[in-house]
């Protein structure tokens, strides 16, 4: 279990706004999280958990 993620391996969970999961094994939480990400972002499609759309997103620049 990831000390920075409140879930057991394989279970579903959600990333907090700060997303400190580094080695998360959850099925619904990825290692990389974008706090803002437009729909269709290539990086988000590769595993980012998007928390909201924004035109000021830096993770897809």
Curated annotation (Swiss-Prot):
Residues 1-29 are annotated as: Beta. Interacts with EOLA1. A divalent metal cation 1 binds at residues 5, 7, 21, 24. Gene3D superfamilies: Metallothionein Isoform II. The modification Phosphoserine is found at residue 58. GO terms for molecular function: metal ion binding; zinc ion binding. A divalent metal cation 2 binds at residues 7, 13, 15, 26. Class I metallothioneins contain 2 metal-binding domains: four divalent ions are chelated within cluster A of the alpha domain and are coordinated via cysteinyl thiolate bridges to 11 cysteine ligands. Cluster B, the corresponding region within the beta domain, can ligate three divalent ions to 9 cysteines. A divalent metal cation 3 binds at residues 15, 19, 24, 29. It comes from Homo sapiens (Human). The gene is MT2A. This metallothionein binds zinc. The lineage of its organism: Eukaryota, Metazoa, Chordata, Craniata, Vertebrata. InterPro entries: Metalthion_dom_sf, Metalthion_dom_sf_vert, Metalthion_vert, Metalthion_vert_metal_BS. This is Metallothionein-2. A divalent metal cation 5 binds at residues 34, 36-37, 50. Keywords: Acetylation, Cadmium, Metal-binding, Metal-thiolate cluster, Phosphoprotein, Zinc. Pfam families: Metallothio. Metallothioneins have a high content of cysteine residues that bind various heavy metals; these proteins are transcriptionally regulated by both heavy metals and glucocorticoids. GO terms for biological process: cellular response to cadmium ion; cellular response to copper ion; cellular response to erythropoietin; cellular response to interleukin-3; cellular response to zinc ion; detoxification of copper ion; intracellular copper ion homeostasis; intracellular zinc ion homeostasis. A divalent metal cation 7 binds at residues 50, 57, 59-60. One of its GO terms (cellular component) is nucleus.
